Amino acid sequence: MIEEIQKLNGFIVIDKPQGPTSHQVDYWVRQILGTEKVGHIGTLDPNVTGVLVMAIGKAVRLIDVVHEKPKEYVGVMRFHSDISEEEVREVFRKFTTRIYQLPPVRSAVSRKVRIKTIYELDMIEKKDKIVLFHVKCESGTYIRTLCTDIGYVSGKGGQMVDLRRISTGPFKEDIAITLQDLQAYVDLAKEGKDELFRSHFLDMTYAFIDYPKIVAKKSAVENIAHGSDLYVGGVKLIDGNFQKGDRVCVLSEDNELLGTGIARCDSSNLFMKVVDFDHIFVEAKHGKGDVVRDREKDVQRPGQQVHRNIRDAAHGPDSRTGRGRKETGPQIAPNRVRKLQNKTGVHRRPGSH
């Protein structure tokens, strides 16, 4: 059974305890599952508890996708001076919008002012200067900084005391398990009792519960596996509405995750290219397997193609490798090559003949 666990691709939601870093949790999950392909989504500070989504296997390639989703927290902040409930609600209303944030000194990113959106900010309970609150915010929002800013704007001063993450996108607190639970479930699975483990292991499609979905025709699957984008002729059906620029999920007719990418048209008006993939997960029948599209790698450096054209014209298309066809066709005279080089500014490498 342990061999099957090591081949699984999906997510496990860990209820991170107070104390260890997120990277320490990564290490422990690797040790428990016996696999190296493990990564967390959304780093939590050592003193913060709650939802830490662990991506397993191929799902590590979806970390950047899930990380885009909003996060929810329940926290405790302390005001430095007496403040009424109405004053708390009023200052919370002021922050339920787009705000400017400067990351703290101890952060994993550069200290540049950023714009983040606070979708919800509510007071749950108040006792004296202590306020229990709930916040739903854009990914990358620093709650400790938010509490400090709230205290400053209120004129009372304030700081965060405690914090717990309760959701990352579709991954909620109620499906989280402790590291001890995970170890126990894996031990049971080794004995052939894998029901508990499988009930808490989430398929990769779980990350796209709230995304619009496109089902591709069987005839399009092999093309997608070889890196092709999805065109209108390969669309079988659409579940949900989307607009150009939205992220969409592409499934097979058997509900297998083929890939995800950016829509190039509206769902109400499909035209030519429908999805521009940035992640492809389906394996080709006769290929190298999974494909992760990186558009930047397809961009050529200035002069790169010009250099190739001159080289091919002078020495034949296979001159760089010395392999291939013996007959290269008509060649340009050396003086013509020099003129082309002077005109374009592209010259042969030293030592070339």
UniProtKB/Swiss-Prot annotation:
The keyword Nucleus does not apply. Residues 336-353 have a biased composition (Basic residues). Keywords: Isomerase, tRNA processing. The keyword Isomerase applies. GO terms for molecular function: RNA binding; tRNA pseudouridine(55) synthase activity. The active site is at D45. GO terms for biological process: box H/ACA sno(s)RNA 3'-end processing; mRNA pseudouridine synthesis; rRNA pseudouridine synthesis; snRNA pseudouridine synthesis; tRNA pseudouridine synthesis. CDD domains: PUA. It holds the Pfam family PUA. It catalyses: uridine(55) in tRNA = pseudouridine(55) in tRNA. InterPro entries: Dyskerin-like, PsdUridine_synth_cat_dom_sf, PsdUridine_synth_N, PUA, PUA-like_sf, PUA_sf, tRNA_PsdUridine_synth_B_fam, TruB_arch. Residues 309-328 have a biased composition (Basic and acidic residues). Its EC number is 5.4.99.25. Residues 211-287 form the PUA domain. It is an enzyme of class 5 (isomerase). Residues 292-353 are annotated as: Disordered. Could be responsible for synthesis of pseudouridine from uracil-55 in the psi GC loop of transfer RNAs. Belongs to the pseudouridine synthase TruB family. Type 2 subfamily. HAMAP family: TruB_arch. This is Probable tRNA pseudouridine synthase B. It comes from Thermoplasma volcanium (strain ATCC 51530 / DSM 4299 / JCM 9571 / NBRC 15438 / GSS1). The gene is truB.
